[in-house]
């Protein structure tokens, strides 16, 4: 059992860690993203595509050198939290994450993206009603905490769609829906993009699973062979669209395609 003074110290420390990490990821791309972009850059054959990739890497380096966000749209912060029921700061974790976002907003600095919809007022802190959004997975009889941070930018979120499929549409319906959205909307989402596909018994669950799928390391595959094959075929097919970096045509369209699913009575929600 923690004393009140020790608990407050732990709260302050965890808040600082999450705030620093959130500020840091706005300036530095994950290693798997950088490695994949290098791979796509080396494989690019169009002169315009090569110029754009060169500009991307120049921008990423300047973000590190200047300690400033790599993109002006730092998005709304989302957390995916897997936490044990015996984690000592479970009761304080929601407020810790909120405070961490407000501190990261100043540290980075992050663009103020939290606007109270009906009041039409920007809170100026990247926090507000339902922001930061937190998705919880509570693990019984466990005292660990795993926190994943996702910056939901307006551009990269643009192709996000949900749809109820008829059971008879099957895998083909999933593929068709993904292609329709990427081919028409990804051009405005700063491609090459990461595609996350969630398949579940409700559109709400599918949407959450699609976000979680994006957090998987690039190049990793679903443990189910059929799902892994679906991911591979989506990636190969989408790249044949030739959307190219920043949508100006090129050899690739996506960095990868990942999927997650939940068991259900039919394959009808995406």
From Swiss-Prot:
Sequence similarity: Belongs to the class-I fumarase family.
Stated name of the protein: L(+)-tartrate dehydratase subunit alpha
Known partners and oligomeric status: Tetramer of two alpha and two beta subunits.
UniProt organism field: Shigella flexneri
Disulphide bond pairs: none
Residues that, per the record, bind iron-sulfur cluster: 71, 190, 266
Catalytic activity of the protein: (2R,3R)-tartrate = oxaloacetate + H2O
Taxonomic lineage: Bacteria, Pseudomonadati, Pseudomonadota, Gammaproteobacteria, Enterobacterales
PANTHER family noted in UniProt: FUMARATE HYDRATASE-RELATED (PTHR30389), L(+)-TARTRATE DEHYDRATASE SUBUNIT ALPHA (PTHR30389:SF19)
Cofactor(s) needed for function: iron-sulfur cluster
Any GO molecular function: metal ion binding
Sequence segments annotated as region (Disordered): 249-270
Regions annotated as coiled coil: none
Keywords: 4Fe-4S, Iron, Iron-sulfur, Lyase, Metal-binding
EC number: 4.2.1.32
Highest taxon of source: Bacteria
């Amino acid at each position: 059992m923690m004393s009140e003074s020790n608990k407050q110290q732990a709260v302050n420390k965890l808040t600082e860690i999450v705030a620093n990490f959130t500020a840091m990821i706005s300036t530095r791309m994950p290693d798997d993203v950088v490695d994949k972009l290098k791979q796509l850059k080396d494989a690019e054959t169009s002169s315009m595509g090569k110029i754009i990739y060169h500009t991307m890497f120049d921008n990423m380096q300047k973000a590190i050198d200047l300690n400033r966000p790599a993109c002006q749209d730092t998005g709304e912060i989302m957390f995916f939290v897997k936490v044990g029921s015996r984690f000592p700061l479970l009761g304080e974790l929601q407020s810790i994450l909120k405070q961490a976002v407000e501190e990261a907003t100043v540290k980075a600095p992050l663009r103020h993206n939290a606007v109270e919809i009906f009041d039409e007022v920007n809170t100026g802190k990247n926090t507000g009603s339902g922001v930061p959004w937190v998705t919880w997975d509570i693990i019984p009889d466990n005292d660990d905490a795993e926190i994943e941070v996702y910056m939901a930018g307006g551009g990269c979120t643009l192709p996000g769609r949900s749809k109820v499929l008829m059971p008879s549409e099957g895998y083909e319906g999933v593929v068709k829906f993904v292609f329709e959205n990427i081919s028409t909307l990804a051009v405005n989402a700063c491609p090459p993009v990461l595609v996350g596909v969630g398949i579940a018994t409700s559109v709400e669950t599918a949407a959450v699973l699609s976000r979680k799928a994006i957090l998987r390391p690039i190049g990793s595959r679903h443990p189910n062979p059929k799902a892994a094959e679906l991911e591979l075929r989506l990636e190969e097919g989408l790249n044949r669209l030739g959307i190219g970096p920043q949508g100006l045509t090129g050899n690739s369209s996506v960095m990868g395609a990942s999927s997650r699913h939940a068991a259900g009575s039919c394959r009808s929600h995406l």
